[in-house]
Amino acid sequence: MTLTYVFHSGFVLETEKSILIFDYWLDLNGVVPPFLKKDKPVYVFSSHFHEDHFNSDIFEWRKQREGITYILSKDIYKHRRASKEDADVWLAKGSTWSDGTLYVWALGSTDSGVSWIVETEGKRIFHAGDLNNWYARFLPEAEPGETIYSEEFDEDIDPIAHEKQYLGELKDIRKITDSFDVVMFPIDGRIGNGYTLGGRQLIERFKVGLFVPMHFVASGFESAWRMKEFTDEKSIPFWEITKEGETIEI
């Protein structure tokens, strides 16, 4: 089983029997086309409607081949980014789906859409989508019940409530499992101080076979490697991605 980095939060997981594509946005190095030519069923996941996690170009792949199953978050349809007939499966938080090859759980997010648990061929995979403790840098100055104005987000935010929501989502995930063979999770330096906090809180609560950073394209590959210090403390393997198209054995 291999995992290939496409771009941003996009990955291709190839198993013995199938190919899974997560959160395709851009493919600057032509990583995906060779996978579409393989004689295996393809499953395409999009966690939410944001343009950096969903690109309607994925539907063009149907013209190239048969055997593609589209598994999309319902918020994509709600925000009119796709028609109901575009996807084979629409899922919201709490929904599940299986075809005997894949077993899929749609979990919550602290932003839009869902995060994914996928079980296939004896492996349990987690793709976080936009689930994260996004306002971590505001926590040191936060007071319970009070909001802080963020120029970046142009809104009043409540970092303590947001963190509580995030930890609540992790608690919901633990009701299903406490371990993953692979975790793909946002390590985004744009958050500022504390940008690894969400990842650290996750590995404190779950056994992780391999931690894979994502959502770091704006701050660079090396910014994501900051998380390795914390995975090393727990003897969790960390994938130091260095380029698009890079592949790791799972």
Task: Report the location of each language-model feature.
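Residues that mark the start of a beta-strand
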Residues: 2, 18-19, 103, 115, ...
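Pre-active-site segment of Zn-dependent metallo-hydrolases
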Residues: 6, 10-51, 56-61, 131-176
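Active-site beta-strand termini and strand-to-loop segments that position acidic
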Residues: 13-16, 99, 118-121
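Short hydrophobic/aromatic beta-strand or adjacent loop that forms the aromatic wall/cage
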Residues: 8-10, 112-115
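Active-site HxH/HxHxD metal-binding segment of metal-dependent hydrolases
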Residues: 33-97
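Binuclear metal-ion centers of metallo-dependent hydrolases, dominated by the metallo-beta-lactamase
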Residues: 4-8, 81-97, 174, 191, ...
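Active-site environment of divalent metal-dependent phosphoester hydrolases
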Residues: 27-30, 49-54, 77-80, 95-97, ...
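Active-site neighborhood of phospho(di)ester-bond hydrolases with catalytic His/Asp-centered motifs
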Residues: 21-25, 40-54, 70-75, 126-130, ...
